[in-house]
Regions:
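A C-terminal functional module that forms or caps the active site or interfaces directly
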Residues: 156-201
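His/Asp/Glu-rich mid-to-C-terminal helical/loop segments that flank catalytic regions of hydrolases
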Residues: 203-233
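Mid-sequence, gly/pro-rich, charge-dense loop/helix-turn segments that line enzyme active sites
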Residues: 84-170
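Proline-aspartate-enriched helix->loop->beta-strand connector
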Residues: 71-76
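Alpha-helix C-terminal capping segments
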Residues: 65-69, 87-88, 184-192
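Generic non-transmembrane alpha-helical segments
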Residues: 23, 129-144, 185, 221-232
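N-terminal short beta-loop-beta anion/metal-coordinating cradle
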Residues: 2-64, 70
Length: 233
């Protein structure tokens, strides 16, 4: 029998998973579908961690391979994202209560914007228990956090027009490029999931300047929260 994971961790970039991987005990690595999956133990639990790459297709490939190969009870998508709600500032944390794919649009044939055909859903709800643990961890670490809708799409949002469209159409407070695809994949497989994002940029005209400045710090905050979730879940 292969490695059965209690928790699976997915991040898009090395900065988002490197530190978590370094904490693994009894670690090993296996390549599936072109993605390196790092397995081991954290806080006595079987954990699998992967860097999926940027964008929805890479994220979905990674989540599907992880579920089929390691059967995690919970998938955690950790990393950084852009602020959609103007109240958010760099290094704030957003815990998604639901995910939406903002670039999914078949409204020309009468569907609601964001509808995923075949399963007839616009939003995917995250695991309530995992969300509560993350909120408690944020309070303990004195991190400024928000809970709300996170929007996913295959575009780095860096214009006020895109930001306003995502906010008004979906009620999203943050945006990124993987969470909605991981949520979609987890949903069709019956796997629980949670998505957390540390804000690295303002998703507007300043985004390209904010992002490299705040990325390393934001990724470290996400790592601390993810480790707390693994310990308590």
């Amino acid at each position: 029998m292969g490695f059965k994971a209690n928790i699976g961790i997915i991040g898009a970039m090395d900065d988002e998973v490197r530190e978590i991987i370094s904490h693994l005990e009894d670690k090993s690595v296996e390549t599936v579908s072109g993605i390196d999956f790092h397995t081991g133990k954290l806080f006595g639990k079987n954990v699998v961690i992967a860097r999926c790459g940027v964008g929805k297709v890479f994220a979905a490939i990674c989540a599907e391979a992880m579920i089929i190969k390691y059967s995690p009870d919970l998938i955690v998508n950790t990393g950084v994202g852009g602020a959609v709600d103007k109240v958010l500032r760099p290094l704030d944390i957003v815990f998604a209560d639901k995910l939406v794919q903002h670039d999914m649009d078949t409204s020309a044939i009468g569907d609601p914007v964001g509808l995923i055909s075949g399963i007839n859903r616009v939003y995917f709800e995250t695991d309530a228990r995992a969300r509560e643990i993350l909120v408690d961890a944020a309070k303990t670490l004195s991190v400024n956090y928000y809970v709300g809708t996170v929007a996913t799409g295959d575009k780095f949002i860096s214009s006020v027009a895109d930001k306003n469209r995502i906010s008004s159409t979906f009620g999203a407070i943050a945006c990124e490029m993987e969470g909605g695809a991981i949520a979609h994949t987890a949903f069709v497989n019956g796997t629980s999931f949670i998505v957390g994002r540390a804000i690295s940029d303002s998703a507007d005209g300043d985004a390209s300047m904010d992002y490299p400045t705040f990325l390393p710090i934001a990724a470290n905050i996400s790592t601390d929260l993810t480790l707390a979730l693994i310990e308590k879940y």
